[in-house]
């Protein structure tokens, strides 16, 4: 199995790659990689500073028929690509936040109903796109995680790759299990 981590210039993308490469074959790629060059069993859209620097990520989401996990900016790209909305958050910067799991399925299978995660809410999804549903929230953000109704597309606002996030390894394990199907 091969997973590609799309580098959106975020400070934690190397941690995403390290978390995945210990489990399966993984490679970090530029977000300008042509879609026809992407051959993988799954794709992770990493975090980054802004939507303006998201390269071809929207094209990957619209074109590829493989599981995708969007992390932070990756979630926001997913939401906007499919008709959702992203706006500045009320609470900016990185902080620990309590995540409330609304749906224990997919990437959140086996994760407790509440856990602490490291997240930035400088920007956040404020309108969930059609054909997606909200699967986690917090007291500062109504849309902490989403999943598509029929495709294996998932997104989280928090950073499962950092040590400050509880159950981050489980989120990655669940995503890899989805990629194996």
UniProtKB/Swiss-Prot annotation:
Residues 2-181 form the Glutamine amidotransferase type-1 domain. The active site is at residues 72, 159, 161. Pathway: Purine metabolism; GMP biosynthesis; GMP from XMP (L-Gln route): step 1/1. Its EC number is 6.3.5.2. Keywords: ATP-binding, Glutamine amidotransferase, GMP biosynthesis, Ligase, Nucleotide-binding, Purine biosynthesis. Pfam families: GATase. The keyword ATP-binding applies. It catalyses: XMP + L-glutamine + ATP + H2O = GMP + L-glutamate + AMP + diphosphate + 2 H(+). This is GMP synthase [glutamine-hydrolyzing] subunit A. It comes from Methanothrix thermoacetophila (strain DSM 6194 / JCM 14653 / NBRC 101360 / PT).
């Amino acid at each position: 199995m091969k997973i590609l981590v799309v580098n959106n210039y975020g400070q934690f993308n190397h941690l995403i790659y390290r978390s995945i490469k210990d489990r399966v074959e993984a490679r970090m790629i530029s977000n300008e990689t042509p879609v026809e060059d992407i051959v993988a069993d799954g794709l992770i859209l990493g975090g980054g500073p802004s939507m303006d620097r998201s390269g071809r990520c929207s094209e990957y989401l619209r074109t590829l028929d493989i599981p995708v996990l969007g992390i932070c900016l990756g979630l926001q790209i997913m939401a906007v690509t499919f008709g959702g909305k992203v706006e500045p958050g009320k609470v900016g910067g990185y902080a620990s936040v309590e995540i409330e799991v609304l749906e224990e399925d997919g990437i959140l299978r086996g994760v407790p109903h509440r856990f602490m995660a490291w997240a930035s809410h400088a920007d956040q999804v404020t309108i969930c796109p059609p054909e997606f549903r909200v699967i986690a929230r917090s007291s500062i953000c109504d849309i902490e995680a989403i999943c598509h109704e029929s495709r294996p597309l998932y997104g989280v606002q928090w950073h499962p790759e950092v040590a400050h996030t509880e159950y981050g390894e489980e989120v990655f394990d669940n995503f890899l299990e989805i990629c194996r199907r």
